[in-house]
Design a protein with these regions (language model features):
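Short glycine-enriched loops at secondary-structure junctions
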Residues: 76-80, 124-127, 177-178
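Charged catalytic cores and adjacent phosphate/nucleic-acid-binding surfaces used
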Residues: 2, 85-93, 127-275
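Generic beta-sheet signal
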Residues: 116-118, 171
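A metal-dependent hydrolase metal-coordination microenvironment
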Residues: 1-114, 121, 143, 150-151, ...
Length: 275
């Protein structure tokens, strides 16, 4: 997909394939072993807690990423009931196994305690509005949120851009992919969602600095959204103006606008159709 960076953020509270994997490995595990607390989105885990190694997906991704020159951002998705609580990505985590707490707010605090940046995922998913429920009021009020997803899959939340501006959050666009990107995007003629991060390089340190400085834009289905000045800077860096001919009788010019980027721009005059 032409990516430089990939964030690995498996669900903490929802791990639907654990039971199937245990069945597949029944000769290697004690008879009667069952998945434990593998769906605790709407209820708390019991005293046994989470048995899985939540750091393993990051480890596996890093091993494969070396073959492709990809940088892996370690993370996890804190996944609670979507309307009252919502979903949150913890990025740059150091130990995903220490994130979970029965109190969702404490889970976010646990992420911040290990230096993670927390992104509010798909804030309009399954909701009728982007108004803050009580949990979000507390989470934002404590300064636990660093970024917000304004595009997720085929969904776009324009009002989240205003929130990002007001609360000084970085913006992002993500696939939230649970299948192959070729199936979901490429075979339908689309490029995958992605976040454009204006970093000095693709090291974890440079990426984190860019996110903290909010130098990001969101791309989805041919649309780029985010901070107006960053959008202007991207366009002027991509498109050049070249005068091809000047009519000496009236001064009219014929110009070309070569686009040096891989982004397709559509030009419109105010109130008119595309040029």
């Amino acid at each position: 997909d032409g990516l430089d960076v990939l964030a690995i953020t498996e669900h903490v509270e929802y791990r639907r394939h654990e039971g199937k994997m245990l069945n597949f490995l029944k000769g290697y595990v004690p008879e009667g072993t069952e998945a434990i607390n593998n769906n605790i989105i709407r209820r708390s885990a019991d005293e046994r807690g989470i048995q899985s190694d939540l750091n393993l997906p990051v480890k596996l991704a890093r091993e494969t990423a070396r073959k492709y020159g990809l940088t892996i951002i370690p993370g996890a998705e804190i996944t609670r009931e979507p309307i009252a609580y919502g979903h949150y990505n913890a990025l740059f985590t150091t130990d995903n196994n220490s994130l979970y707490a029965t109190d969702a707010l404490q889970s976010l605090r646990n992420a911040k305690a290990q230096g993670a940046l927390v992104m509010h995922n798909h804030p309009g998913w399954r909701r009728k509005s982007l108004e803050h429920p009580e949990f979000e009021v507390k989470a934002y009020g404590e300064g636990l949120i660093d970024g917000i997803e304004i595009m997720n899959g085929a969904e776009f939340y324009p009002k989240a851009i205003a929130r990002a501006h007001a609360r000084k959050l970085f913006v992002s666009a993500n696939t939230d992919i649970h299948d192959a990107t070729a199936e979901t995007y490429r075979l339908q003629g689309h490029s995958r969602n992605m976040t454009l991060i204006f970093a000095r390089n693709n090291s974890l340190e440079a990426l984190r600095e860019a996110l903290e400085a909010r130098r990001t834009l969101a791309y989805s289905f041919g649309t780029i959204a985010g901070d107006e000045q960053l959008l202007k800077d991207l366009f002027t860096a991509s498109v050049r103006t070249k005068v091809l001919h000047t009519d000496p009788s009236n001064g009219r010019r014929t110009v070309s606008l070569p686009n040096g980027s891989s982004v397709e721009y559509v030009l419109r005059f105010p109130g008119q159709n595309r040029v």
